């Protein structure tokens, strides 16, 4: 007998496992708001070298992220972009909370070249450029985000 695809316990466990893995790849650490996590991932490049800067992000996520872009600008400047006209997000056009930077900024793109199960052994190459960017913005967390920013960036949707 062949098990039914969608009622098989093995298939169900596999599906749930895959969904859990996919969800965890995009999850933020629980101690941060989405705006705080955005700042850690895309603004606060703690080192001029990707391998060192990515260690901070990877330690929170407990894995080596494949790629990441750091905008060499301030959080306040990105918050200002949230005031630009809203547009559909290129990565998900059903969302209309994205905003185009309007000006190019210097950025560093980090690309994983040496993956490892040990986070400290992951190595990255970096590419610098000046590009426009598109961010998704949402209302801030009234308790944990800075009160001067009612709307904050929560996702770097695209660099162009």
UniProtKB/Swiss-Prot annotation:
Primary gene name: RNASE2
- InterPro entries assigned to the protein according to its UniProt record, in alphabetical order: RNaseA, RNaseA-like_dom_sf, RNaseA_AS, RNaseA_domain
The active site of this protein is located at 42 (proton acceptor), 155 (proton donor)
Pfam families recorded: RnaseA
Disulphide bridges: 50-110, 64-122, 82-137, 89-98
Gene3D superfamilies documented for this protein: Ribonuclease A-like domain (3.10.130.10)
Print the keywords alphabetically: Disulfide bond, Endonuclease, Glycoprotein, Hydrolase, Lyase, Lysosome, Nitration, Nuclease, Signal
Q: How is this protein annotated for GO cellular component? A: extracellular space; lysosome
E.C. designation(s): 4.6.1.18
Q: Report the family membership.
A: Belongs to the pancreatic ribonuclease family.
Sequence positions bearing 3'-nitrotyrosine: 60
Q: Which residues are glycosylated?
A: 34, 44, 92, 111, 138
Q: Which organism is it from?
A: Papio hamadryas
Give the catalytic activity: an [RNA] containing cytidine + H2O = an [RNA]-3'-cytidine-3'-phosphate + a 5'-hydroxy-ribonucleotide-3'-[RNA]; an [RNA] containing uridine + H2O = an [RNA]-3'-uridine-3'-phosphate + a 5'-hydroxy-ribonucleotide-3'-[RNA]
Protein location: Lysosome; Cytoplasmic granule
Per its record, how is this protein called by name?
Non-secretory ribonuclease
User: What does the UniProt record say this protein does?
Assistant: This is a non-secretory ribonuclease. It is a pyrimidine specific nuclease with a slight preference for U. Cytotoxin and helminthotoxin. Possesses a wide variety of biological activities.
Keyword field contains ATP-binding: no
Specify the signal sequence span: 1-27
């Amino acid at each position: 007998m062949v098990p039914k695809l969608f009622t098989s316990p093995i298939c169900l466990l596999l599906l749930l496992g895959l969904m859990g893995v996919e969800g965890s790849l995009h999850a933020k650490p629980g101690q941060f708001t989405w705006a705080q996590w955005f700042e850690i991932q895309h603004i606060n490049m703690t080192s001029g070298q990707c391998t060192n800067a990515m260690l901070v992000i990877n330690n929170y996520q407990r894995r080596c992220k494949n790629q990441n872009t750091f905008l060499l600008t301030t959080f306040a400047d990105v918050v200002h972009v949230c005031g630009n006209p809203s547009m559909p997000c290129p990565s998900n056009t059903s969302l209309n909370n994205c905003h185009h930077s309007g000006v190019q900024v210097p950025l560093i793109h980090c690309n994983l070249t040496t993956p490892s199960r040990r986070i400290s052994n992951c190595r990255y190459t970096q590419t610098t450029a000046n590009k426009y960017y598109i961010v998704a913005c949402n209302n801030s967390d009234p308790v944990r985000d800075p009160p001067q920013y009612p709307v904050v960036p929560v996702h770097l949707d695209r660099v162009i």
